[in-house]
């Protein structure tokens, strides 16, 4: 039986769609319109007008329908998406464009003229398209801003471009207002995609107006609907058509590039027109039906071509409902696009859905080939809409096996596109040079990496090219422009390619020696090779990886001693053990450790072409010799992992739990069998918080039991403990609260979800109001998190207080038993200050009891008898313990930080009512309108609804908010006394040596400044004359923070108090002053005037530091300093309640919140020297 080829199946699909699908038939491009658009001499606005007139009655653009939804609990109204799209015609779209153009053009005070700049901040939508097209109509220069960019970056761009007008969605109004208040030039702020019926959107709009008005700003704030209404009654604005010989600027696309400094790629009128006229696979040839879903930002060239390429063909451009891709596949299923541009991340999401469906449907005896076909057919028809005719992938390399998988799902070729903002979106397609737009290309030698045009069998080198779509340069950056072109005018791509034949190129590598792995982590392979070469068993090592992979491999030449007396298996085990030991000693990250390796007994030499004349590894030659074997190893590892995980899912019911847990960890982390001991820790095997998240999800799939990340990474838990935890959960019969059981699904969480009856039994809740209050003053205090950075100083404060009265401090610390827990706590005070350690030990001997427990466990991990003893004897609870992780999502922090706090509440309302001191975070304010924020207001009202997303610290902030909500509920239930402390940066202890938080960003910065000896002229944006501005750094010493929390917590024997633990002064004490103090103390630090120059020199210097210093440096957080900060005077949040309480209680030497001082900064240096980091 003959099997259809993919092309035959595609042709049959096309014929069927044109015969049966009315939407597809109606979207066929018109030859007359296509010819007019492509006619020589057509200018950008003429093309747009021609398209809009030629397809006037067709549907042009579609967005998700919505309805208004009022929350019964809060009374707030929001938009709820409906499972359908609504469209407008080309005529209606162009009418909207005309209204906006007329309003702007005829504005009596600030008319917009050709050449003026308009900046847009938001996600792609019909309103966004309207504004963009209005710019085209008038000849204005569009500046699409990256919605994810830091405010400092946005300000830099707006300062450089001086736009007359800034348009923003409600979601980004805070950033827009920050830019305007920073003194940028827009005269108007237009708010688009605005629905005043939505309470949050209306609040954002009103807040923006109020903030600008309060600041005395003259910026006019109005909605796009108001602009359109004004323009509706005005004469039409003239269509901008430049003179024949004129090619004015039409668009700036800003890209950070490799330097991190925003650079505006200039698109002239002619270049911008090619986005409509192009005939590339991405844009679509003039006869291809275009129905697509636009999910890429308009600040990216692919996003713009995706939109305009479809409109130019008379198709329908639908817009994704949300920018975070949370509705992407729901949107795709509703739209059923005929074409799509994939990015690798979306391919990963499809594959994850495939794996999940495959596992869900797998049953014993199922035919895997049949199941594979069924799942892929279901994905193709339902998940992806079932009528794709063209699919393209781009923006980053896609692994070959992923490409094969996607093609098998789509039943279509997945075309591989290569381009860039500077060169144009369509330079290569399926490795073939695209002519047009490419006019010429060449390869140039890269001798430092060993790539030459004389290489055989194929020439290799950096790709340089000339193309019709290449930008003329960067806006106002002549020096940077000069760097990206050679003397013959060829654009330097920075990419190494191999020329298989004329016009057929294959991507090889980036010229930069720093390798970016697929998860976004950068590794310096030469550095890693040097680290591992220190092993007595390793003679030479070649590290191998690519941007398509998340982990590294290696080729190892063993030493003669290593080879002597060992067979292959024993040798490999010895080498693997050596690598792990060296990695641990060097504090390498898991992604920096090769997961597997080839053993080569022939050394790399000059003679065999693997070393250069100065004995450097010749990477191209090494890749040529070992590349195929290493790629096969990647394939084998992936296959082995998938097979093992599938086997585990099937066999888990018949295997001991410990065996399943160990095999799952082995498969997920790719470690050797010899390392899989029952007493091994997940983190010691190379796991980190992200891999722990995947492991947690896997264990839940296998066992049907929630295994939080905190349990996986707990230093008290070995693999056998994880197995015991799972067995206990399976046998308990009781289900602990989870994110889903409390909040349901979705991306919003509500304070109303967090009711105590979801966490605490009815009997305890019913009795809470009738139990006696704990005695005052407290004599028995329970402290969680005592071995944490702040926790240790709270421990010391309470030991000192209770020692005077004969009281007892009980600390719950993670550990396999009480002795191990006590050892962990003791080590927190052993920082190199003998006086501190002796003081602690003397107090502890008289006053301290340590229990082994875990806040994430039922009963805090304590047995019933101990729990009951605490319930009956504890007088006050201090709860700073939390899983502090700014990467993990709320779902994973829910167990330790929310359920754990609920257990604290349960203890507090059992047997006697015990006041609670709770440590929260200023991150709670992250999702609160600054105008609505009050220090002591009820968080349930101030932040009733919050968004769950994957942004930095979102999960942690939400988890601490949830803890506050639960405590508010407990207070309402029975008058439980509560004191909440929202802390910001907690700095070093003022007195005790070595006591500073090595992991926090401030310590890392001080270390990096002193170690590199360079600092910027100012960390903040300078004034118009280039002078330093008055600024403030918000932080408090750990000892004052602990003293304040303890003193105020003792007083909280009734009521509910909330304090923002901040340094609120407009005192001019900032990062700049810290550098001044360091210089005055004799540390040789050079100030660099140009901030960008400093940043790049700083990064280079940090990367060159010794390994121990580099690991403790600011390198992982360096992006925070990529651009100068706004000069903020005073604290970001109010702290009046806290300051008044501190003054009344006379806390600290000054009986007030202290100012930061030079001695504290000097102590940072001495502490880092004591810890041998400086």
Curated annotation (Swiss-Prot):
Gene3D superfamilies: ACP-like (1.10.1200.10), N-terminal domain of ligase-like (3.40.50.12780), NAD(P)-binding Rossmann-like Domain (3.40.50.720). NADP(+) binds at residues 787-790, 814, 824, 880-882, 920, 956, 960, 983. Keywords: ATP-binding, NADP, Nucleotide-binding, Oxidoreductase, Phosphopantetheine, Phosphoprotein. One of its GO terms (molecular function) is long-chain fatty acid-CoA ligase activity. Its EC number is 1.2.1.-, 1.2.1.30. One of its GO terms (biological process) is biosynthetic process. The modification O-(pantetheine 4'-phosphoryl)serine is found at residue 689. AMP binds at residues 300, 395, 416-417, 421, 495, 507-510, 516, 616. Binds 1 phosphopantetheine covalently. 4'-phosphopantetheine is transferred from CoA to Ser-689 by Npt. Pfam families: AMP-binding, NAD_binding_4, PP-binding. It catalyses: a carboxylate + ATP + NADPH + H(+) = an aldehyde + AMP + diphosphate + NADP(+); an aromatic aldehyde + AMP + diphosphate + NADP(+) = an aromatic carboxylate + ATP + NADPH + H(+). GO terms for cellular component: membrane. Residues 655-730 form the Carrier domain. Is competitively inhibited by anthranilate when using benzoate as substrate. Its cofactor is pantetheine 4'-phosphate. InterPro entries: ACP-like_sf, AMP-binding_CS, AMP-dep_synth/lig_dom, ANL_N_sf, CAR, Far_NAD-bd, NAD(P)-bd_dom_sf, PKS_PP-bd. The conversion of carboxylic acid into aldehyde involves three key steps: adenylation of the bound carboxylic acid substrate to form an AMP-acyl intermediate, formation of a thioester linkage between the acyl moiety and the phosphopantetheine prosthetic group, and reduction of the thioester intermediate to the aldehyde. Monomer. NCBIfam families: carboxyl_red, Thioester-redct. Catalyzes the ATP- and NADPH-dependent reduction of carboxylic acids to the corresponding aldehydes. Catalyzes the reduction of a very wide range of aliphatic carboxylic acids as well as many aryl carboxylic acids. Aryl carboxylic acid substrates include substituted benzoic acids, phenyl-substituted aliphatic acids, heterocyclic carboxylic acids, and polyaromatic ring carboxylic acids. Cannot reduce benzaldehyde to benzyl alcohol. Belongs to the ATP-dependent AMP-binding enzyme family. Carboxylic acid reductase subfamily. The N-terminal domain likely catalyzes substrate activation by formation of an initial acyl-AMP intermediate, the central region contains the phosphopantetheine attachment site, and the C-terminal domain catalyzes the reduction by NADPH of the intermediate thioester formed from the attack of the phosphopantetheine thiol at the carbonyl carbon of acyl-AMP. Large-scale domain motions occur between the adenylation and thiolation states. Phosphopantetheine binding alters the orientation of a key Asp, resulting in a productive orientation of the bound nicotinamide. This is Carboxylic acid reductase. It comes from Nocardia iowensis.
């Amino acid at each position: 039986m003959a099997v259809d080829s993919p092309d035959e199946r595609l042709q049959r699909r096309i014929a069927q769609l044109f015969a049966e699908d009315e939407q597809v038939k109606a979207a066929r491009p018109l030859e007359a319109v296509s010819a007019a658009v492509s006619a020589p001499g057509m200018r950008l606005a003429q093309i747009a007008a021609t398209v809009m007139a030629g397809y006037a009655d067709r549907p042009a653009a579609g967005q998700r329908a919505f309805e208004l939804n009022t929350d019964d609990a809060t009374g707030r109204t929001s938009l709820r998406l409906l499972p359908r799209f609504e469209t407008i015609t080309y005529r209606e779209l162009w009418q909207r464009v005309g209204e906006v153009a007329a309003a702007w053009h005829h504005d009596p005070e600030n008319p917009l003229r050709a050449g003026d700049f308009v900046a847009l901040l938001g996600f792609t939508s019909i309103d966004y398209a309207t504004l963009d097209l209005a710019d085209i109509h008038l000849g204005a220069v569009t500046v699409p801003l990256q919605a994810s960019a830091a405010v400092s970056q946005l300000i830099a761009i707006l300062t450089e471009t001086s736009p007359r007008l800034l348009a923003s969605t409600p979601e980004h109004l805070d950033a827009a207002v920050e830019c305007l208040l920073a003194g940028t030039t827009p005269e108007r702020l237009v708010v688009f995609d605005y629905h005043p019926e939505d309470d949050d959107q209306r609040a954002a709009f009103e807040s923006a107006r109020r903030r600008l008005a309060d600041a005395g700003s003259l910026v006019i704030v109005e909605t796009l609907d108001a602009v359109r209404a004004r323009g509706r009654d005005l004469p039409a604005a003239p269509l901008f058509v430049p003179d024949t010989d004129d090619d004015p600027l039409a668009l700036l696309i800003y890209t950070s590039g490799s330097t991190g400094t925003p650079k505006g790629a200039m698109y002239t009128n002619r270049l911008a027109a090619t986005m409509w006229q192009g005939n590339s696979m991405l844009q679509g040839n003039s006869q291809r039906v275009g129905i697509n879903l636009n999910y890429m930002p308009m600040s990216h060239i692919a996003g713009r071509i995706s939109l305009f390429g479809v409109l130019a063909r008379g198709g329908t451009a639908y817009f994704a409902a949300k920018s975070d891709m949370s509705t992407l596949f729901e949107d795709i299923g509703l739209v059923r696009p005929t074409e799509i541009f994939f990015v690798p991340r979306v391919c990963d999401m499809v594959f994850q859905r495939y794996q999940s469906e495959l596992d869900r449907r797998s049953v014993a005896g199922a035919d895997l080939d049949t199941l594979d076909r069924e799942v892929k057919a279901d994905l193709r028809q339902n998940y992806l809409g079932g009528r794709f005719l063209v699919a393209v992938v781009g923006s980053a390399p896609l692994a070959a096996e992923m490409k094969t998988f996607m093609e098998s799902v789509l039943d279509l070729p997945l075309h591989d596109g290569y381009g860039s903002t500077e060169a144009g979106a369509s330079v290569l397609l399926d490795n073939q040079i695209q002519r047009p737009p490419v006019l010429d290309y060449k390869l140039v030698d890269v001798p430092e990496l060993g790539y030459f045009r004389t290489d055989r069998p194929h020439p290799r080198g950096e790709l340089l090219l000339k193309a019709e779509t290449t930008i003329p340069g960067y806006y106002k950056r002549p020096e940077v422009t000069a760097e990206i072109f050679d003397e013959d005018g060829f654009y330097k791509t920075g990419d190494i390619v191999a020329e298989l034949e004329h016009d057929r190129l294959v991507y090889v590598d980036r010229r930069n020696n720093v390798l970016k792995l697929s998860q976004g982590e950068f590794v310096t392979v030469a550095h890693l090779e040097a680290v591992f070469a220190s092993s007595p068993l390793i003679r030479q090592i070649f590290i191998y990886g690519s941007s398509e992979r998340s982990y590294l491999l290696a080729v190892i030449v063993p030493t003669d001693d290593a080879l002597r007396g060992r067979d292959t298996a024993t040798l490999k085990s010895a080498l693997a053990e050596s690598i792990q030991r060296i990695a641990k000693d060097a504090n390498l990250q898991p992604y920096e450790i090769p997961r597997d390796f080839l053993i080569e007994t022939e050394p790399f030499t000059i003679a065999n072409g693997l070393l250069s004349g100065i004995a450097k590894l010749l990477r191209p030659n090494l890749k040529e010799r070992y590349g195929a074997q290493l790629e096969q190893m990647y394939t084998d590892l992936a296959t082995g992992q998938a097979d093992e995980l599938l086997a585990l899912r099937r066999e888990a019911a018949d295997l001991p739990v410990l065996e399943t847990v160990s095999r799952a960890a082995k498969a997920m982390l790719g470690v050797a069998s010899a390392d899989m001991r029952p007493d091994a820790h997940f983190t010691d095997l190379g796991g980190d918080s992200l891999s722990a998240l995947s492991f947690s999800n896997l264990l839940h799939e296998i066992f049907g039991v929630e295994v939080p990340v905190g349990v996986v990474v707990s230093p008290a838990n070995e693999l056998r403990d994880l197995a015991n935890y799972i067995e206990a959960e399976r046998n308990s019969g009781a289900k602990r609260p989870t994110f889903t059981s409390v909040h349901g699904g979705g991306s919003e969480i509500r304070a109303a979800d967090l009711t105590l009856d979801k966490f605490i039994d009815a009997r305890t809740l019913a009795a809470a109001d009738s139990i006696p209050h704990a005695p005052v003053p407290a004599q028995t205090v329970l402290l969680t998190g005592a071995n944490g950075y702040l926790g240790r100083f709270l421990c010391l404060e309470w030991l000192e207080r209770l020692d005077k009265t004969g009281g007892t401090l009980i600390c719950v610390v993670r550990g396999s038993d009480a002795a191990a827990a006590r050892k962990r706590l003791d080590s927190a005070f052993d920082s190199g200050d003998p006086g501190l350690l002796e003081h602690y030990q003397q107090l502890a001997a008289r006053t301290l009891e340590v229990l082994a427990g875990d806040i994430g466990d039922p009963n805090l991990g304590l047995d019933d008898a101990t729990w009951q003893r605490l319930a009956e004897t504890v007088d006050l609870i201090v709860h700073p313990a939390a899983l502090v992780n700014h990467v993990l999502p709320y779902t994973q922090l829910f167990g330790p930080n929310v359920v754990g706090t609920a257990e604290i509440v349960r203890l507090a309302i059992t047997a006697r009512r015990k006041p609670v001191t709770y440590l929260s975070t200023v991150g709670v304010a992250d999702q609160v309108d600054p105008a609505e924020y009050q220090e002591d207001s009820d968080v349930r009202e101030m932040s009733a609804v919050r968004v769950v997303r994957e942004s930095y610290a979102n999960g942690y902030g939400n988890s601490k908010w949830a803890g506050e909500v639960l405590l508010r509920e407990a207070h309402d239930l029975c008058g439980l006394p509560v004191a909440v402390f929202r802390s910001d940066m907690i700095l070093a202890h003022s007195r005790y040596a070595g006591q500073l938080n090595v992991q926090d960003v401030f310590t890392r910065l001080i270390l990096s400044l002193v170690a590199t000896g360079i600092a910027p002229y100012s960390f903040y944006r300078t004034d118009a004359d280039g002078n330093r501005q008055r600024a403030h750094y918000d932080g408090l010493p750990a000892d004052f923070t602990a003293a304040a929390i303890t003193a105020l917590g003792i007083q909280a024997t009734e009521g509910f108090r909330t304090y923002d633990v901040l340094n609120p002064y407009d005192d001019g004490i900032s990062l700049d002053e810290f550098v001044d103090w360091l210089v005055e103390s004799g540390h040789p630090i050079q100030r660099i005037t140009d901030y960008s120059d400093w940043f790049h020199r700083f990064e280079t210097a940090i990367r060159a530091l010794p390994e121990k210093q580099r690991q403790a440096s600011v390198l992982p957080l360096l992006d925070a300093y990529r651009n100068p900060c706004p000069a903020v005077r005073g604290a970001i949040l109010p702290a009046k309640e806290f300051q008044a309480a501190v003054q009344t209680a006379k806390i600290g030497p000054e009986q007030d919140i202290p100012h930061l001082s030079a001695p504290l900064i000097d102590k940072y240096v001495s502490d880092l020297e004591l810890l041998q980091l400086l």
